[in-house]
Amino acid sequence: MKKKQTLALLALALVLVLGGAAVLYQRLSGENLPGSQLSAQEEADGGAAPPAELPVAPDFTAYDAEGEPVSLSDFLGKPVVVNFWASWCGPCQSEMPDFQEKYLELGEEVAFLMVNMTDGSRETVESAAAFIEESGYTFPVVYDSDASAAIAYGAYSLPTTYFIDAEGHAIARATGAIDGETLQKGLDMIYPGA
């Protein structure tokens, strides 16, 4: 058991180091992240880029509170909002009421996957589940205990949110806490009329 915790901590440390390097590179080079470029391109062209030009969102599998696997590919054919978060993260906590509101409004049409960054020490399934229950949130939560989803998405800082269209294309990315207006803008990109 200790070995799994150590491996999870090492994976999380690697994610954080790589994330810091990516953020530093982005700031120094002035380049946008792929999701930001897609958002800017879509707005500049007045419409979505042809699907062939859009990156396909990486599939991942994480586990729900009962230990059942949940994969992004399970939702193909439906727009998806993927949010990487942790219960100890203040900015993550600040955006959750907006996610809950939109989940209650659009949960039948848009899939919401709240991916908890479970490292086994600072963040455990138990602590995250307790936070969700105490806060009264009902959106789906999955646990990324090996950081594979975070690594696949380059979610190097928390919170990070991806907006994925029904065909599985990564349309936009938001790093840091987002407000209701930004969440709505992302939803409009993947589900017009949201």
Model regions and ranges:
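Thiol-/selenol-based redox modules, centered on thioredoxin-like
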Residues: 163-194
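Thiol-based oxidoreductase modules, predominantly thioredoxin-like and allied folds used
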Residues: 110-124, 137-146
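Conserved helix-turn-beta segment immediately C-terminal to the redox Cys motif
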Residues: 78-79, 96-116, 133, 180-181, ...
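N-terminal targeting signals for export/organelle localization
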Residues: 1-56, 194
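Conserved hydrophobic/aromatic "anchor" residues
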Residues: 60, 70, 75, 84-85, ...
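Short, internal strand/loop/helix patches
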Residues: 129-167
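A short beta-strand-turn-helix
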Residues: 51-54, 59-80, 104
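Conserved redox-active cysteine motifs that mediate thiol-disulfide chemistry
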Residues: 76, 84-101
